[in-house]
């Protein structure tokens, strides 16, 4: 699985919003949902590449699809 290094958490939130996710709540992490899936994004920059890969997988996207949304 190719990694997604250096992704800013705000860019990740915007990309997931384009994919149909909405912010459910915020704190030290941003919790987003599309109605059936829930993903949690840490609010620190940059988000670790392995963590970002897991978030993308949990959102039901491929790394390539996510990169197109960035």
Can you describe what each PLM-predicted range is?
Residues 1-70:
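Basic nucleic-acid-binding interfaces
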């Amino acid at each position: 699985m190719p990694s997604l290094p250096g992704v800013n958490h705000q860019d990740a939130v915007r990309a997931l919003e384009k994919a149909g996710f909405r912010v459910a709540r915020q704190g030290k992490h941003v919790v987003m949902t599309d109605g059936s899936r829930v993903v949690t994004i840490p609010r620190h920059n940059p988000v670790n590449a392995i963590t970002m890969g897991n978030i993308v997988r949990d959102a039901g996207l491929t790394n390539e699809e996510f990169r197109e949304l960035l």
